[in-house]
Protein backbone atom coordinates (compact mmCIF):
# COMPACT_ATOMS: atom_id res chain seq x y z
CA UNK A 1 0.00 0.00 0.00
CA UNK A 2 2.79 2.43 0.84
CA UNK A 3 2.64 6.03 1.96
CA UNK A 4 0.24 7.14 -0.80
CA UNK A 5 -2.23 4.35 -0.04
CA UNK A 6 -2.07 4.99 3.70
CA UNK A 7 -2.76 8.68 3.15
CA UNK A 8 -5.73 7.92 0.86
CA UNK A 9 -7.25 5.62 3.49
CA UNK A 10 -6.67 8.23 6.21
CA UNK A 11 -8.40 10.92 4.13
CA UNK A 12 -11.32 8.60 3.36
CA UNK A 13 -11.69 7.76 7.05
CA UNK A 14 -11.61 11.48 7.90
CA UNK A 15 -14.48 12.21 5.48
CA UNK A 16 -16.48 9.49 7.26
CA UNK A 17 -15.67 10.94 10.69
CA UNK A 18 -13.45 8.02 11.64
CA UNK A 19 -9.99 7.85 13.14
CA UNK A 20 -7.24 5.77 11.56
CA UNK A 21 -4.23 4.24 13.33
CA UNK A 22 -1.01 3.04 11.71
CA UNK A 23 -0.04 -0.29 13.25
CA UNK A 24 3.73 -0.29 12.93
CA UNK A 25 6.66 1.95 13.73
CA UNK A 26 9.32 3.64 11.65
CA UNK A 27 10.26 6.90 9.95
CA UNK A 28 7.57 6.62 7.25
CA UNK A 29 4.89 6.03 9.88
CA UNK A 30 5.97 9.10 11.85
CA UNK A 31 5.83 11.26 8.72
CA UNK A 32 2.38 9.94 7.82
CA UNK A 33 1.09 10.52 11.34
CA UNK A 34 2.39 14.08 11.27
CA UNK A 35 0.31 14.67 8.13
CA UNK A 36 -2.89 12.92 9.30
CA UNK A 37 -5.34 14.84 11.50
CA UNK A 38 -7.43 11.83 12.50
CA UNK A 39 -4.77 9.61 14.08
CA UNK A 40 -3.90 9.42 17.76
CA UNK A 41 -1.48 6.63 18.65
CA UNK A 42 2.08 5.84 17.55
CA UNK A 43 2.73 2.14 18.00
CA UNK A 44 6.09 0.93 19.29
CA UNK A 45 6.38 -2.78 18.51
CA UNK A 46 6.97 -5.21 21.37
CA UNK A 47 8.51 -2.78 23.84
CA UNK A 48 8.13 -2.38 27.56
CA UNK A 49 10.21 -1.18 30.50
CA UNK A 50 12.25 -4.41 30.48
CA UNK A 51 11.70 -5.48 26.87
CA UNK A 52 13.74 -3.86 24.09
CA UNK A 53 12.36 -3.45 20.58
CA UNK A 54 13.61 -6.50 18.64
CA UNK A 55 13.93 -4.60 15.36
CA UNK A 56 17.57 -4.30 14.24
CA UNK A 57 19.39 -0.98 14.49
CA UNK A 58 19.65 -0.06 10.81
CA UNK A 59 19.94 3.71 11.22
CA UNK A 60 23.14 5.74 11.59
CA UNK A 61 21.49 9.05 12.47
CA UNK A 62 20.36 8.35 16.04
CA UNK A 63 16.79 7.40 15.04
CA UNK A 64 15.23 4.94 17.46
CA UNK A 65 11.93 3.22 18.15
CA UNK A 66 12.90 2.24 21.69
CA UNK A 67 10.96 3.55 24.70
CA UNK A 68 13.50 6.32 25.21
CA UNK A 69 12.38 7.97 21.95
CA UNK A 70 9.22 9.18 23.73
CA UNK A 71 9.65 12.65 25.23
CA UNK A 72 8.35 13.83 28.61
CA UNK A 73 5.02 14.89 27.05
CA UNK A 74 4.46 11.54 25.32
CA UNK A 75 5.52 12.60 21.83
CA UNK A 76 7.99 11.07 19.39
CA UNK A 77 9.95 13.32 17.02
CA UNK A 78 9.45 13.24 13.27
CA UNK A 79 12.83 12.81 11.53
CA UNK A 80 13.98 15.82 9.53
CA UNK A 81 16.18 15.89 6.48
CA UNK A 82 15.95 14.60 2.91
CA UNK A 83 13.57 11.76 2.13
CA UNK A 84 12.31 10.13 5.31
CA UNK A 85 14.87 12.07 7.35
CA UNK A 86 17.02 9.09 8.33
CA UNK A 87 20.27 7.58 7.13
CA UNK A 88 20.72 3.84 6.91
CA UNK A 89 23.61 1.63 8.03
CA UNK A 90 24.12 -0.04 4.65
CA UNK A 91 27.06 -2.10 5.92
CA UNK A 92 24.81 -3.68 8.56
CA UNK A 93 22.01 -4.19 6.04
CA UNK A 94 24.32 -5.75 3.43
CA UNK A 95 25.97 -8.01 6.03
CA UNK A 96 22.59 -9.36 7.20
CA UNK A 97 20.93 -9.59 3.78
CA UNK A 98 19.49 -13.02 3.00
CA UNK A 99 18.43 -12.29 -0.59
CA UNK A 100 18.78 -9.64 -3.27
CA UNK A 101 16.17 -9.00 -5.95
CA UNK A 102 16.98 -6.53 -8.70
CA UNK A 103 14.18 -5.22 -10.88
CA UNK A 104 15.22 -3.70 -14.18
What are these regions (language model features)?
Residues 1-75, 79:
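Shared catalytic-loop signature of beta/alpha-barrel
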Residues 82-104:
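Extended hydrophobic packing segments that form well-structured cores
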